[in-house]
């Protein structure tokens, strides 16, 4: 399970290191292979263990092709999906297309969300969490939870 927010640095070549605490989990779950793709609602990236992506991909492919929103989601999620492998130092090289999509510079935030991560530019991450609207409604599913 991935959780927490981690400040990480991307070098000039576009390489970034996955935090050490997740490397063994990723090695066990997917032999260090991850799939990175575009987020459909925010200018950030989604990072999945390859095994998790393999379960999600058929669901994305099954979306109705005549639904404009579904087609856009397919284009973003599948069109940007890139399989990457952690090197011996736990680093991956993010392709320029993904870096450009998420407007990345040197400082990034890797945010654990259970079975996946979100990868944000540090500036966009802090702007998004500062932009919490008190009028935002909780999803119905959360109303039954006791935290």
Curated annotation (Swiss-Prot):
<dbReference type="GO" id="GO:0000976">
    <property type="term" value="F:transcription cis-regulatory region binding"/>
</dbReference>
<dbReference type="InterPro" id="IPR007159">
    <property type="entry name" value="SpoVT-AbrB_dom"/>
</dbReference>
<dbReference type="InterPro" id="IPR020603">
    <property type="entry name" value="MraZ_dom"/>
</dbReference>
<dbReference type="GO" id="GO:0003700">
    <property type="term" value="F:DNA-binding transcription factor activity"/>
</dbReference>
<dbReference type="InterPro" id="IPR038619">
    <property type="entry name" value="MraZ_sf"/>
</dbReference>
<protein>
    <recommendedName>
        <fullName>Transcriptional regulator MraZ</fullName>
    </recommendedName>
</protein>
<keyword id="KW-0677">Repeat</keyword>
<dbReference type="InterPro" id="IPR003444">
    <property type="entry name" value="MraZ"/>
</dbReference>
<comment type="subunit">
    <text>Forms oligomers.</text>
</comment>
<keyword id="KW-0804">Transcription</keyword>
<keyword id="KW-0963">Cytoplasm</keyword>
<keyword id="KW-0238">DNA-binding</keyword>
<keyword id="KW-0805">Transcription regulation</keyword>
<comment type="similarity">
    <text>Belongs to the MraZ family.</text>
</comment>
<dbReference type="InterPro" id="IPR037914">
    <property type="entry name" value="SpoVT-AbrB_sf"/>
</dbReference>
<dbReference type="GO" id="GO:2000143">
    <property type="term" value="P:negative regulation of DNA-templated transcription initiation"/>
</dbReference>
<dbReference type="Pfam" id="PF02381">
    <property type="entry name" value="MraZ"/>
</dbReference>
<feature type="domain" description="SpoVT-AbrB 1">
    <location>
        <begin position="5"/>
        <end position="52"/>
    </location>
</feature>
<feature type="domain" description="SpoVT-AbrB 2">
    <location>
        <begin position="81"/>
        <end position="124"/>
    </location>
</feature>
<dbReference type="GO" id="GO:0005737">
    <property type="term" value="C:cytoplasm"/>
</dbReference>
<dbReference type="InterPro" id="IPR035644">
    <property type="entry name" value="MraZ_C"/>
</dbReference>
<dbReference type="InterPro" id="IPR035642">
    <property type="entry name" value="MraZ_N"/>
</dbReference>
<dbReference type="GO" id="GO:0009295">
    <property type="term" value="C:nucleoid"/>
</dbReference>
């Amino acid at each position: 399970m991935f959780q927490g927010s981690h400040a990480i640095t991307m070098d000039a070549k576009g390489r970034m290191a996955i935090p050490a605490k997740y490397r063994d989990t990723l090695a066990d779950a997917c032999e260090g292979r991850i799939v990175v793709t575009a987020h459909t609602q925010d200018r950030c990236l989604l990072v999945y263990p390859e095994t998790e992506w393999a379960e999600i991909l058929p669901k994305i492919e099954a979306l109705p092709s005549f639904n404009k929103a579904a087609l856009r989601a397919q284009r973003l999620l599948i069109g940007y999906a890139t399989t990457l492998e952690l090197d011996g130092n736990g680093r991956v090289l993010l392709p320029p297309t993904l870096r450009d999509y998420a407007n990345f510079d040197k400082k990034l935030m890797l945010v654990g969300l259970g079975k996946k991560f979100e990868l944000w530019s540090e500036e966009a991450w802090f702007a998004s969490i500062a932009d919490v609207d008190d009028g935002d409604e909780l999803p119905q599913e959360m109303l039954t939870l006791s935290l």
